Amino acid sequence: MKKVLIVEDDPVWAKLMQYYISEAGADSRVVIAPGQALEMIDDWHPDALVLDMLLASETGVALLNELKSHEDLANLPIIVCSNVGITRDDMEPFGVRAVLDKSTMTPAQVRQALTEVLQ
């Protein structure tokens, strides 16, 4: 079973993403901060990452920079879900494979993005 790590500090959104990931046939875990994400990546070895860009402790950009600096993590598939108005072109230098707008995304869009990055 594929594994997806969710980095999200809003418990409602985290549960919703877990549901979508479960519906896509994958297992998931949730952390609320970039530092926790790095620990979980080392311990759990997820196949993909779903990242909120606006976290209480810091922005998702800090985690993206950290992942990019680790050769063994540079190719980890990442889906950004946020309300910030970010485009895939903005995130391409970080290796982000999909960008979903929380205010308009549908379950079908989440499933499609997950299917594409988990292939």
Please state what every model-predicted region is.
Residues P11-R29:
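Two-component/phosphorelay signaling modules centered on CheY-like receiver
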Residues D52:
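Active-site residues of response regulator receiver
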Residues V30-A48, Q109:
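Acidic, metal-coordinating helix/loop segments flanking the phosphotransfer/catalytic sites
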Residues V61-A74:
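Short amphipathic alpha-helix used as the core "switch/output" element in two-component signaling
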Residues A56:
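The feature encodes the CheY-like receiver
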Residues I79-C81:
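Hydrophobic/aromatic residues positioned on beta-strands within the core alpha/beta folds
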Residues A33, T59-A62:
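Acidic catalytic/metal-coordinating carboxylates
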Residues E8:
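Conserved acidic carboxylate
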